[in-house]
Amino acid sequence: MFTGIIQTQATVESVTNTDGIMRLIIAVNTPYVAQLNLGASIAINGCCLTVVKVVETANNDQAQVYFDVIDETLALTNLGKLKQGSLVNYERSVTFGTELGGHIVSGHIHCVASIEQIVKQQNNVKMQLSIPKQWQKYVLYKGFVAINGASLTVGNVDEHGFWLHLIPETLAITNLSAAQLGDTLNIEVDQQTYTIINTVESYLSQQG
């Protein structure tokens, strides 16, 4: 489980594909791997991945973290588009006592969104995203959504998708500042919204 509060950005050092598995190696500042064990969960661009190896670099400023990503994950997320030098959002899983500053995020990506518009304003950035039609009903005005793992509040919603308003803090901490028109972003809809809508629809269908 995660909070949707991005801790830092990591840099992709290597991407290799072998027998349906993508080996992803990222470099991250050493404090973010403190007491990190093999098998631990880390959200990379909001996608929950399992740590398979950790290697500290010679200068001890950074560490390499290894993940194996399966085909199903690559098909549902934007991780397959990563390349050397890409920046990814990084969040370690919740531990006892962690402040829940965003909303509860599972790390299970539902779909990807395409960036349709980017409007840069004086103190923020507006971004319009489109998502597959079947997921649109779970994105509600002023509701929560996780974008590349970042817990954000939904702005206006229309037939074309929905808008985000990105404040300077979000732009500074996450990789959304580097997003461009046509890029795809990982989407996890709010689990409570998802459950309520599905429950109501199921009930109404049984009554019909």
Per-region residue spans from a language model:
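Conserved loop->alpha-helix
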Residues: 1-208
